[in-house]
C-alpha cells in the first residue's frame, strides 16, 4: 500500500502500524545496529508506481526502514514523500544486474552503486528478519 506521507496523518500512522507493526524502540534499534538504510538510488519503478517518478530528469532516491512485521520503503518526489508499507509475507527480493523489491504487484529496482554496496549489510538484516518471520508460519516436517 502506497501512502502520501508528506504531512502527519494519524490515520496513516495507525494503518502503517497495523500492516508492518510498530517501530523498534531506541535501545532495540541500537542493539540491531540500526533499523534504517542509507539513501538508495532507484533505477526503475513498476508501471503502477510511475506516479512517484520525478517528472524532470532527476535521480529518484528511496530509504528503507525495518519494522517488526515488515518494511517501509520511503520515496521522495520533489517536496512530496511517499511510503510503501510491505509486510514480510509479501516481500520478495530479486538480485540480478540490479536488486529489486517486489510486493503487491509492484516493484522498485535499485542501482548497484556505491550507496547500494554500503547498504548490503542492512539488506541482509532484512532478509534474515523475513526468514525468521516465515519460520514462525512454516509447516512442521513429517
Regions found by a protein language model. Give the residues of each.
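Acidic, Ser/Thr- and proline-rich intrinsically disordered linker/docking segments
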Residues: 1-45, 90-142
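Short, contiguous, helix-prone interaction/anchoring segments in small proteins
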Residues: 33-66
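Phosphoinositide-binding peripheral membrane targeting modules
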Residues: 55-94
Amino acid at each position: 500500500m502506497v501512502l502520501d506521507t508528506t504531512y502527519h496523518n494519524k490515520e496513516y500512522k495507525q494503518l502503517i502500524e497495523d500492516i508492518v507493526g510498530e517501530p523498534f524502540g531506541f535501545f532495540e534499534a541500537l542493539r540491531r545496529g540500526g533499523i534504517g538504510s542509507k539513501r538508495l538510488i532507484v533505477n526503475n519503478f513498476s508501471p503502477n508506481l510511475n506516479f512517484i517518478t520525478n517528472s524532470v530528469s532527476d535521480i529518484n532516491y528511496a530509504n528503507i526502514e525495518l519494522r517488526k512485521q515488515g518494511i517501509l520503503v520511503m520515496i521522495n518526489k520533489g517536496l512530496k514523500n511517499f511510503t510503501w508499507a510491505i509486510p514480510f509475507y509479501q516481500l520478495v527480493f530479486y538480485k540480478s544486474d540490479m536488486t529489486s523489491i517486489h510486493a503487491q504487484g509492484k516493484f522498485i529496482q535499485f542501482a548497484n552503486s556505491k550507496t547500494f554496496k554500503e547498504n548490503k549489510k542492512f539488506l541482509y538484516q532484512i532478509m534474515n528478519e523475513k526468514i525468521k518471520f516465515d519460520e514462525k508460519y512454516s509447516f512442521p516436517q513429517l
